[in-house]
């Protein structure tokens, strides 16, 4: 696969992963009510996210409430907010860096510098995926630990929500896309012909006898 194809495929994966990360950040489904034992039949289900909590009635009616106070939130929610938003903003910056270093753009002159810019974009997407993976795994670990904690009442136990799975898929796409971008940039650095240089050859001059030198025909 050529370097241009790697860049395009990597950028598409990163854009899809970026969209998934934004979706996971905004969805109020990081943890959902766990139905255990006598709690199987219930009139409502509770969803909790980074920005709001929602209560879904058995009739299908849903009521959401945005968190009023930041200081009243738990440590993991505050950290997840900061890290997830940072990852989303970093992906936005990485998009412009990647486009500047792409072979199909003229923001940077073709050559090793352009390949290094593209490589920087790939590294930023990799770091973005890792940055988003930290709050997802941290939050999931807390939910699982409280789920198996016998001291936590059954009514307060939660399960992993859909937003966590969407976030994990998004981070996977970001990291795979970042790897492809890095590979495409690495191919460019090892192949000077991809910078499309213009080369001129000096005209051959005949010898004193009027004939061209024999070495020109070897």
Curated annotation (Swiss-Prot):
It is found in: Cell junction, Tight junction; Cell membrane. Residues 1-7, 103-122, 181-218 are cytoplasmic. InterPro entries: Claudin, Claudin5, Claudin_CS, PMP22/EMP/MP20/Claudin. GO terms for molecular function: identical protein binding; structural molecule activity. Residues 29-81, 144-159 are extracellular. One of its GO terms (cellular component) is tight junction. The keyword Zinc-finger does not apply. Keywords: Cell junction, Cell membrane, Membrane, Tight junction, Transmembrane, Transmembrane helix. It holds the Pfam family PMP22_Claudin. One of its GO terms (biological process) is positive regulation of bicellular tight junction assembly. Residues 217-218 are annotated as: Interactions with TJP1, TJP2 and TJP3. Signal peptide: none annotated. Directly interacts with TJP1/ZO-1, TJP2/ZO-2 and TJP3/ZO-3. Interacts with MPDZ. Belongs to the claudin family. This is Claudin-5.
